[in-house]
């Protein structure tokens, strides 16, 4: 099997791609809000509760999702979370009440809270300590890219069909991203296309190796 050069950068690009979808999905409501409020009769006060439901669930979900990722494993846990927020995004289209939307936003926020912990976990797993700042910056590009791509895509979906269609499309992207992540992501120990040279480069820069080297140097002195 042919080895892939700079395999670690493929992995961080993958998590960046998932982060793009993550932020695209969460931004969709803000773009569609005027149309939703006009067609459903949802008031500004009710809309504020919808927004708050997401923020509360997202805030509470971050440490929980971090624990979930550490416990279950990065590959499976992040795929599950992406699938859940994809289904929750699509669920927006099935409800026209503020309480229904608030529930979907809360479910979406809780599962979307996995994105940053997953990105940090990928960077710490795949990169030596000296490159993690750059790796984290690369995957975090997805936050801005997702927020940037959402307005034209969501607006087009609304004009082409309806606000419900916009959430079906954006949610479908998350489901595809979940599958893509599950089948493409590999931990270094399972990555058959990772060269021995790059594997050594990554592992030699990990904390456990750096500590060992430091102890050896200290004992020699």
Where are these regions (language model features)?
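Residue-level signature of mid-helix packing/kink "hotspots" within the transmembrane helices
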Residues: 27, 55-63, 147-148
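Juxtamembrane intracellular "pre-TM" segments in multi-pass secondary transporters
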Residues: 1-4, 187-221
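Helix-breaking motifs and short loop linkers at transmembrane-helix boundaries and internal kinks
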Residues: 41, 73, 94-100, 111, ...
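Conserved MFS/SLC helix-loop-helix module at the cytosolic interface between two early adjacent transmembrane helices
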Residues: 60-99
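Cytoplasmic helix-loop-helix junction between adjacent transmembrane helices
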Residues: 104-143
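Extracytoplasmic
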Residues: 10-44
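Helix-loop-helix hairpin linking two adjacent transmembrane segments in secondary transporters
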Residues: 143-188
